[in-house]
């Protein structure tokens, strides 16, 4: 899309729309209403635009509410000569605009999609200008990642996913029940059958081989030359957590006489070093198995590589293996792959599950990946490897109990790591023991158990307004705060035994909409529940902080209130899996307070003194507080909090 003011914007033609042609006309974005911005029909099926409202014009439309194909159809019916649909969620700087399946509507004009960022640029600087779309300037997208494709690492185990890829856009699929009908189709639901078909071909060619062997053949021979965006980021390869072993190549797979895999996980194939929170440098070792299906002894060269040269140059991660491995006919040999992490060279972690929870591309700045190439004169196979290291702190306390003398006492906090250990202090108001293993789900169980560990609360000020923060810690971590855990804080403002307000976390916009976790707060039973804050939660963490304005939950700083915290399985069952109930607290009169920890945290390779004081009237105002909860950022998964039980005063 070319305009006089804005640099050319890359747009992806949607193959179910009319064929692209050279068009030029005023760029229009109808802001009359939400309906005209989105281009969706109303409940009665009425086009949001009247008659031929946009003759000779190129119409810019927002994604959302209805199928993109319906937006393009409505634009064509309104006289537009082309439709451009801007995405409504952020994407990575190298991501292509999304591709969509056909969702109905009569297609009379070409439809295109652009990114949210490019849409914002056009809206700000190019409306009313003459825009030109010229197919002669088109760039082939073959061999590049579709923006909609899911990315890894896997949700539960932080292992490499996807395993492999296949074509998934611009598919013309047979339409069931029509005999001759065809329907444009796109998505992972289109690419998965392609991989299934290639596996079936291999099973037909090698009926005696196991599922693991078939998978190894496919993954070892996939094409790794997959990019992201030939226009914006030419030559930049897609990360392992988007392509896995690469794009399937059945001809290579059927002809290979060599396979390789993670010896500890033959069905996984790839070398997944996973998420690693590290307070010091570390080394990880995996064993690779290589099988020779040939009839002669073969000596293979082994070459570990990085996907990105900048990762290798950083020195944060190094990977090594023997130069060669010899394998006799029909046999399997092994070798070690050693991956070392220099924690002092790792980037400072700034990911989260709140405001950045949907920004998968940000993982690129922290994960390290590449391939182990194994080759001889006959075969060249590869294994993907990946690690997601998190430079962590290691704050510990000198005591978990403290008896105050004269209303005061101290606890020493130490941090032997190379990173400042940030500490959030809360009034400890509730704790719960760890559930027995027998109560936890096993592989294949369709339920989750969120096991509460401790609850804390504190008064804060946000933009000059009083607010409350509840800190919750759990046994076990979650890859992302969206699922499978919801935390419900029920507040009884007047001690009548009936909960009056609720605070809870949820995904912004609904299931799988944005990836961002937010906090809702409002009156029971029906709200309205206002969303004002992102959830303060990291990835691969059992910690969460929920924030709410006091005005949204019927409190003042001096209100003594009762509250309970419920843990809910919000993915499988919707059931409450744990609860800490009946806590009483007054925000401006805690029983104990702590001070002395720098805002930057406990210094790296240093210590800080936490001073704890009793508060006059706190025992009556906040009787449930029995100490302080120390909530740690950038912590090891098994040590994200400490509780200090306090007595005396």
Regions found by a protein language model. Give the residues of each.
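Structured lumen-facing ectodomains of secretory-pathway proteins
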Residues: 1-162, 166, 174-176, 240
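Hydrolase catalytic cores
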Residues: 68-101, 165-232
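C-terminal subdomain of the subtilisin-like protease fold in secreted/lumenal serine endopeptidases
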Residues: 107-125, 164, 204-282, 293, ...
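Beta-sheet-dominated interaction scaffolds and their linkers
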Residues: 144-150, 250-294, 321-325, 352-365, ...
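Short acidic, flexible loop segments centered on an aromatic residue
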Residues: 293-314, 388-390, 488-493
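Intrinsically disordered, low-complexity Pro/Gly/Ser/Thr-rich segments with frequent PxxP/GP/PP motifs
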Residues: 315-359
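Terminal connector regions
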Residues: 343-394
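Surface-exposed extracytoplasmic segments
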Residues: 407-649
């Amino acid at each position: 899309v070319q305009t006089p003011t804005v640099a050319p914007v890359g747009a992806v033609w949607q193959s179910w729309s009319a064929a692209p042609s050279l068009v030029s006309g005023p760029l229009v974005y109808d802001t009359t209403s939400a309906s005209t911005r989105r281009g969706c029909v109303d409940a009665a099926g009425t086009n949001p635009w009247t008659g031929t409202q946009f003759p000779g014009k190129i119409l810019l439309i927002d994604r959302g509410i209805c199928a993109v194909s319906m937006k393009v159809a409505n634009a064509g019916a309104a006289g537009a000569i082309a439709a451009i649909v801007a995405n409504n969620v952020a994407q990575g700087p190298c991501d292509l605009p999304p591709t969509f399946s056909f969702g109905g509507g009569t297609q009379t004009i070409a439809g295109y999609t652009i990114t949210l960022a490019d849409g914002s640029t056009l809206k700000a600087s190019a409306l009313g200008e003459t825009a030109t779309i010229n197919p002669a300037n088109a760039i082939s997208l073959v061999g590049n990642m579709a923006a909609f494709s899911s990315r890894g690492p896997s949700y539960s185990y932080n292992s490499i996913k996807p395993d492999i890829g296949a074509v998934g856009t611009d598919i013309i699929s047979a339409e069931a029940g029509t005999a001759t009908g065809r329907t444009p189709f796109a998505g992972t639901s289109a690419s998965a059958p392609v991989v299934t078909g290639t596996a079936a071909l291999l099973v037909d060619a090698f009926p005696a081989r196991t599922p693991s062997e078939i998978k190894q053949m496919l993954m070892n021979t996939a094409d790794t030359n997959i990019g992201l965006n030939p226009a914006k980021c030419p030559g930049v390869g897609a990360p392992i957590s988007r392509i896995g072993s690469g794009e399937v190549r059945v001809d290579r797979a059927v002809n290979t006489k060599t396979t390789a895999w993670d010896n500890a996980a033959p069905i996984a194939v790839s070398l997944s070093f996973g998420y690693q929170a590290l307070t010091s440098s570390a080394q990880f070792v995996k064993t690779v198995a290589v099988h020779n299906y040939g009839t002669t002894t073969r000596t293979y060269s082994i070459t570990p590589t990085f996907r990105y040269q900048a990762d290798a140059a950083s020195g944060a991660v190094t990977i090594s293996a023997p130069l060669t491995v010899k394998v006799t006919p029909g046999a399997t040999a092994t070798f070690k792959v050693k991956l070392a992490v220099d924690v002092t060279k790792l980037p400072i972690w700034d990911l989260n599950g709140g405001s950045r929870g949907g920004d998968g591309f940000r993982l690129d700045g922290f994960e390290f990946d590449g391939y182990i190439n194994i080759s001889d004169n006959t075969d060249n196979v590869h294994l993907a490897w990946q690690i997601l290291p998190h430079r962590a702190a290691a704050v510990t306390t000198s005591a978990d109990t403290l008896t105050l003398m004269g209303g005061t006492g101290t606890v020493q906090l130490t941090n032997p790591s190379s990173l400042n250990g940030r500490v959030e202090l809360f009034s400890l108001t509730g704790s719960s023991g760890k559930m027995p293993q027998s109560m936890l789900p096993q592989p294949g169980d369709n339920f989750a158990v969120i096991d509460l560990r401790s609850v804390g609360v504190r008064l804060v000020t946000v933009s000059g307004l009083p607010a409350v923060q509840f800190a919750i810690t759990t046994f076990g971590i979650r890859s992302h705060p969206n699922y499978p855990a919801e935390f419900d804080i029920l507040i009884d403002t007047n001690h009548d035994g009936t909960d009056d307000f609720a605070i809870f976390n949820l995904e912004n916009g609904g299931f799988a909409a944005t990836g961002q976790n937010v906090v809702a707060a409002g009156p029971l039973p029906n709200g309205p529940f206002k969303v004002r804050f992102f959830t303060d939660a990291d990835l691969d963490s059992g910690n969460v902080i929920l924030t709410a304005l006091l005005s949204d939950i019927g409190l003042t700083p001096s209100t003594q209130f009762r509250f309970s915290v419920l843990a809910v399985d919000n993915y499988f069952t919707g059931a409450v899996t744990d609860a800490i109930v009946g806590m009483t607290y007054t925000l401006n009169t805690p029983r104990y307070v702590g001070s002395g920890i720098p805002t930057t945290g406990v210094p790296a390779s240093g210590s800080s003194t936490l001073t704890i004081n009793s508060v006059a009237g706190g025992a009556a105002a906040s009787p449930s507080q029995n100490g302080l909860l120390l909530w740690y950022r950038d912590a090891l998964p098994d040590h994200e909090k400490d509780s200090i039980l306090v007595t005396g005063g």
